Amino acid sequence: MLFEHYNEIPLGGWPYRYFKPNEVACQGTGKILVNEDALAALDNLRSHLGHSINLSSAYRSPYHNSKIGGAPRSSHLQGHAFDVRLQGRDKEVIRKVAEQVGFKGFGMRYQTFIHIDMGRRRTW
């Protein structure tokens, strides 16, 4: 479900424990696409890791994705991709746990974050 701004989500209508709507909303517009499977997997990832997760990117509106030079068919546009800041954490541990909770796509080539998504199985 798409909301024009994350503050439109009804009180009590957010079932996710570890992430607030503003953390997974588009950073450029405040829009939020609630992808229930992806958000549940993200919550499970946080629970299984046992430490906080900070996101550098989650849902992106088409406008914001274009503005920042994102891929035209980015998984961020469907609300099922997240860029997880490493902050000294082991990238491979995050990848393994993310795979266990249902993520299939992994962008490992970045220095400061790991990209995880619910798309097709692949690693780059």
Predicted segments, located by residue:
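Generic detector of short, locally flexible boundary/turn motifs and exposed helical patches
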Residues: Y18-N22, R46-S52, G79-D83
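Catalytic cores and adjacent binding grooves of peptidoglycan-active enzymes
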Residues: R73-W124
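Histidine (H) residue identity feature
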Residues: H5, H48-H51, H64, H76, ...
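Intrinsically disordered, low-complexity segments enriched in small/polar residues
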Residues: P10-L11, I68, Q100-G105
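Extracytoplasmic cell-surface/polysaccharide-interacting catalytic and binding patches
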Residues: M1-R46, Q111, R120-T123
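Extended, low-complexity, intrinsically disordered C-terminal regulatory tails
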Residues: D37-G69
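N-terminal start-of-chain detector that recognizes signal peptides
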Residues: C26-G28, I53-Y59, L86-D90
